[in-house]
Curated annotation (Swiss-Prot):
This is Olfactory receptor 1E1. InterPro entries: GPCR_Rhodpsn, GPCR_Rhodpsn_7TM, Olfact_rcpt. The gene is OR1E1. The lineage of its organism: Eukaryota, Metazoa, Chordata, Craniata, Vertebrata. GO terms for biological process: signal transduction. Disulfide bonds join 97-189. One of its GO terms (cellular component) is plasma membrane.
Length: 314
């Protein structure tokens, strides 16, 4: 009987966003514009880092991977949301739902790991400037990026395989705009204790520990600055770390608030809004944060534009 129940669910229904029918077209245009902005902004950062030799440094290696992660993170959920809003068809096949969940976890976890790597890079740059090149060697940086990809791949695969073993009965309505893992667990009609324990344990490893490592890095940075207080040193630290701190606050603020600090009167609307912030808004804002507050990125853009003008004027 349980096997029949599992195979009877061939697809799920995504309720999407709690918007009125008359607001559908406006919201569709808004999310399409946000998605295109995310794609173009992050692609611009990747291309600039690739083309400008001045940006071939550890910090920008991590940033290019972060931009790629943001680009993919949005692409996991937003195209399906736009399709459902346009076609008025909220269904998603069972296999597609698990696939979406897998890539959502992969790129979300990858962002967490890369933010830690960038925090460590800033820590070394400010606290050990004379040894920066020796510590942040190309081999170390490539190893960190490769390890981040491997760990997040296995973590996402673990949760996906555990989800695939569950049985789903008659209820196939997901009160979300994507296949959220916690929402899927609520629909399962088999024992989910193993899944919940793995989420609890791995959540600490993937979210809490990286966040604490970032806090530790910035605590050491602040301590280093206070030892030799000067307006020049403070300005340098702010210019070096300001963009990264903004991104960390956006990402971890919403994720921790949603998954690790749920309120007693938690509602579907609140969960949807907070999920929208870190899946749509944060990836869109990251390119603006890093380009508008970063002299290196502005300089790289100017040099690339100047080179193109020179090329076409020949």
């Amino acid at each position: 009987m349980m096997g029949q129940n599992q195979t009877s669910i061939s697809d799920f229904l995504l309720l999407g966003l709690p918007i009125q029918p008359e607001q559908q077209n406006l919201c569709y245009a808004l999310f399409l514009a946000m998605y295109l902005t995310t794609l173009l902004g992050n692609l611009l950062i990747i291309v600039l880092i690739r083309l400008d030799s001045h940006l071939h440094t550890p910090m920008y290696l991590f940033l290019s991977n972060l931009s790629f992660s943001d680009l993919c993170f949005s692409s996991v959920t937003i195209p399906k949301l736009l399709q459902n809003m346009q076609n008025q068809d909220p269904s998603i096949p069972y296999a597609d739902c698990l696939t979406q969940m897998y890539f959502f976890l992969l790129f979300g976890d990858l962002e967490s790991f890369l933010l830690v790597a960038m925090a460590y890079d800033r820590y070394v740059a400010i606290c050990f400037p004379l040894h920066y090149t020796a510590i942040m060697s190309p081999m170390l940086c490539l190893s960190v990026v490769a390890l981040s990809w491997v760990l997040t791949t296995f973590h996402a695969m673990l949760h996906t395989l555990l989800m695939a073993r569950l049985c789903f009965c008659a209820d196939n309505v997901i009160p979300h705009f994507f296949c959220d893992m916690s929402a899927l667990l609520k629909l399962a009609c088999s024992d989910t204790r193993v899944n919940e324990w793995v989420i609890f344990i791995m959540g600490g490893l993937i979210l809490v520990i990286p966040f604490l490592l970032i806090l530790g890095s910035y605590a050491r940075i602040v301590s280093s600055i206070l030892k030799v207080p000067s307006s020049k040193g403070i300005c340098k630290a702010l210019s070096t770390c300001g963009s990264h701190l903004s991104v960390v606050s956006l990402f971890y603020g919403t994720v921790i608030g949603l998954y690790l600090c749920p309120s007693a009167n938690s509602s579907t609307l609140k969960d949807t809004v907070m999920a929208m912030i870190y899946t749509v808004v944060t990836p869109m804002l990251n390119p603006f944060i890093y380009s508008l507050r970063n002299r290196d990125m502005k300089g790289a853009l100017s040099r690339v534009i100047h080179q193109k003008k020179t090329f076409f004027s020949l």
